[in-house]
């Protein structure tokens, strides 16, 4: 991930304590990671609000929502973590959350599900939903 402040490229860990920071200037970085069935529990176990995107490469609406989630991860640095799970490659997570339709967005905190949104949503609707969940902290 390129630092929005100094441009330095950084590796962002799938799981960590706190939010990722730039190695050079220490600015908080957007936290957007891909995970697997094996790494899922570790990736979502954080007190920060986690938005999990259950998606597949062949899914048109999933491809439409991907840039929205990337933008939200940049706009809400330090407030949310976005975790992407390809359900074709990681069917156990999809099965665990009964994902029958994608994209399916799971909102989690400390590894616990707090809300779900099914289908592609425009940015303003997702942002409003996230704002409501952040206000409940």
Place the predicted regions along the sequence by residue.
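Short cysteine-rich clusters marking metal-coordination/redox-active sites
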Residues: 3-6, 22-25
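Short pre-active-site segment immediately N-terminal to redox-active cysteine/selenocysteine motifs
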Residues: 48, 55-58, 101
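Short Cys/His-rich micro-motifs in 6-15 aa windows
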Residues: 25-33
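Non-catalytic, surface beta->alpha helical segment in thiol-disulfide oxidoreductase systems
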Residues: 101-137
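Thiol-based oxidoreductase modules, predominantly thioredoxin-like and allied folds used
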Residues: 35, 54, 65-73, 77-92, ...
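A short beta-strand-turn-helix
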Residues: 33-50
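Cys/His-rich microdomains that often coordinate metals
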Residues: 10, 28-29, 66
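Short linker/helix segments within small regulatory modules
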Residues: 12-20
């Amino acid at each position: 991930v390129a630092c929005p402040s100094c441009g330095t490229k950084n590796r962002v860990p799938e799981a960590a304590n706190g939010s990722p920071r730039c190695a050079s200037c220490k600015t908080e970085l957007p936290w957007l990671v891909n995970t697997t069935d094996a790494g899922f529990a570790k990736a979502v176990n954080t007190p920060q609000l986690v938005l999990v995107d259950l998606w597949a490469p062949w899914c048109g609406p999933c491809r439409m929502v991907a840039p929205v989630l990337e933008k939200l991860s940049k706009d809400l640095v330090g407030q949310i973590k976005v975790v992407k799970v390809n359900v074709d490659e990681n069917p156990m997570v999809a099965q665990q959350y009964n994902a029958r339709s994608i994209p399916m967005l799971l909102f989690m905190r400390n590894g616990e599900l707090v809300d779900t949104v099914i289908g592609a949503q425009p940015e303003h609707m997702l942002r409003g939903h996230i704002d409501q969940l952040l206000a409940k902290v």
